[in-house]
A protein has these predicted regions:
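Low-complexity, Pro/Ser/Thr- and charge-rich linker/hinge segments at domain boundaries
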Residues: 216-230, 236-239, 392-415, 552-565
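Acidic-aromatic/histidine active-site loop/patch
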Residues: 225-307, 314-317, 440, 448
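N-terminal, intrinsically disordered, polar/charged segments of Gram-positive cell-envelope systems
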Residues: 27-90, 239, 244, 249-266, ...
């Protein structure tokens, strides 16, 4: 009996020993894994710090795959002064393109003998080009070394609302010395651009903008491609561009001193405040640039006979420009990043590009004759915007056209292959809103208005996810208003009550000239807090801006009502 008991106890002891060994092995395995994970995080952080130190303006990472856990770890290790809202994550296996952009002061020679101080994204004007491929996950780490708060707005690109870069509305402005990370998925191909939306009329004026190009996965048959960004500069920058009325003598001419505090300005004579302001702006802005260079400093475009050439035009300035590509048979293949079905060949027509707009133009070089892309504008500075196109290196045989010659104006309303668009004039809409664009003088200050009110006073347009919205714009003022809608593409339905008859035209920025009426439609498919505004940014800063709010959306950002730094106009 005793021997039997001893045997049982021996078996129990053996089992205990085995269990102890198993437990010890498991603990060792977990410790080794934890140690490995800590080493991985440490290495990742060290590499990231090294990258941030040595690569301020260039692409710094193109990892093929990154797990969600690594993304969260990376975000937690960046040392950002302001927490960036994480509203999306890369999909498993989604390529990641990461950019480091440092906002910094610099000096740029715009014109021979004229060098000006500028604010830049990455030390150049235009700023660092962000070029990605359809399907990429894009991460842009912005560091602000300027003396002013800034943001980045992705003009025309439907990012999530938290990434839209509107200070005091979707985020706080990025203060000097702080950083912010913008993230979005590159789901829409085309030509876009980015710029600061903090005091944008001043900051874009100072150079805070750059190109955003999303290429298709399947590369088109293009031999040469050029991005051309138009802008205007003041040789002597005016700090106060607040749209105050001109000096006392001009006020006497306009008889403003005896006017009431508030008055509408439409329908007045040539001494109308709007026209006086336009005249003043033309005098102040006296340097016109392409890619930050004017006149003889503009780099020639080198092409060869037979090349398929793509030109991406972006207007980052405050004035519209009439672009002419002389002697070439061209196709306008997209506007505001949106392809035009059945793009037709045209020749020697003026393509008007308004502030904020983009046009992609393609043509085949069919002659060895070098030529100059010029502009047909109503100003004194057309000679500053001549872009040489040198064919087969023949730079001494450039044909220069007469820029005073009258040419046809390109018309989008009947361009491309007709097909029924997503929306029609007569269908039912969930929300219909009239948008009257005008101006008024209030306390001797010129203000630009939407439906009679400025941004601070305006009533938002309230929509909800899934709504179909129709907006009718009427320009009752005497100056152009290129209206820009954030977060959405819209279809143009009609101009001056005449329906569009060509391909469906989709845009995010629309030039509305004095007296014109446009009807557009879009679907509420990007929940968030958005705005629309005039992209003559001086007009936006003077009040022509309006909120568009999704009633079924709750933002992760809560603005501080006591914050006086954020200035979204």
């Amino acid at each position: 009996m005793m021997n039997k008991l001893i045997g049982i106890l021996s078996i129990i002891a053996l089992i205990v020993v085995v269990l102890s060994i198993i437990t010890w092995n498991n603990n060792m395995t977990m410790e080794m894994q934890n140690s490995k994970n800590e080493t991985s995080i440490t290495n990742e952080t060290s590499a990231e710090k090294e990258t941030n130190t040595t690569n301020e303006t260039e692409i710094v990472n193109e990892a093929n795959t990154t797990s969600e856990e690594e993304i969260k770890s990376s975000n937690s290790q960046t040392g950002q002064s302001q927490e960036s809202a994480t509203v999306i994550q890369p999909k498993k296996g989604q390529p990641i393109k990461e950019f480091e952009i440092v906002a910094k002061e610099s000096e740029i020679e715009f014109k021979q003998g004229i060098t000006l101080p500028v604010w830049t994204y990455g030390g150049t004007v235009p700023g660092t080009e962000i070029r990605v491929t359809e399907g990429d996950y894009v991460r842009v780490n912005l560091t602000n070394t300027l003396v002013v708060p800034i943001t980045i707005h992705w003009h025309g690109y439907p990012v999530k609302s938290e990434m839209d870069g509107i200070p005091g509305y979707t985020q706080d402005a990025v203060l000097p010395g702080e950083s912010f990370t913008y993230e979005f998925s590159a789901d829409y191909i085309g030509t876009y651009w980015y710029h600061s939306h903090q005091e944008s009329s001043k900051q874009v004026d100072m150079g805070l903008y750059g190109a955003l190009i999303v290429e298709p996965k399947v590369k088109p048959d293009i031999d040469k491609e050029f991005t051309l960004i138009f802008d205007e500069w003041m040789e002597e920058y005016e700090e106060d561009m607040s749209m105050s009325m001109p000096n006392d003598n001009t006020n006497d001419t306009m008889n403003m001193d005896n006017e009431s505090n508030t008055s509408e300005t439409s329908g007045m004579n040539e001494n109308n405040p709007e026209m006086e302001e336009e005249k003043m702006m033309k005098e102040l802005y006296n340097i016109y640039t392409v890619n930050g260079k004017s006149g003889e400093l503009i780099s020639p475009l080198a092409v060869n006979i037979g090349d398929v050439v793509k030109l991406r035009f972006i207007n980052a300035g405050y004035r519209s420009h009439g672009i002419h590509i002389p002697g070439q048979v061209v196709k306008i293949v997209s506007t505001d990043g949106q392809n035009i079905m059945g793009a037709e060949e045209i020749k020697d027509q003026i393509i008007t590009i308004a502030p904020g707009e983009r046009y992609d133009v393609e043509f085949v070089v069919q002659s060895d004759q070098s030529f100059v892309i010029d502009v047909h504008d109503e100003n004194l500075y057309n000679d500053q915007l001549k872009i040489p196109v040198v064919v087969d290196g023949e730079s001494d045989k450039i044909l220069v056209e007469d820029i005073t010659k009258e040419l046809l104006n390109f018309d989008l309303s009947g361009y491309g292959s007709y097909s029924e668009g997503q929306f029609t004039i007569d269908q039912e809409y969930d929300v219909e809103q009239g948008i009257e664009l005008n101006s008024k003088v209030d306390n001797n200050k010129l203000e630009y208005t939407i439906n009679g009110t400025t941004f601070d006073e305006s009533q938002p347009i309230t929509i909800k996810t899934g709504d179909i919205i129709k907006l009718t714009y009427e320009n009752k003022s005497l100056v152009d208003h290129p209206m820009h809608l954030h977060g959405h593409f819209f279809q143009i339905l009609s101009k001056d009550d005449i329906p569009f008859t060509g391909a469906p035209i989709w845009k995010d920025t629309l030039l509305i000239k004095p007296g014109e009426k446009y009807v557009i439609a879009f679907k509420a498919d990007n929940p968030g807090n958005w705005v629309q505004h005039c992209h003559e940014l001086h007009h936006a800063s003077a009040g022509m801006m309006q909120k568009i709010i999704y009633s079924d959306y709750k933002s992760s950002y809560t603005p501080d009502p006591n914050n006086t730094v954020n200035k979204p106009e």
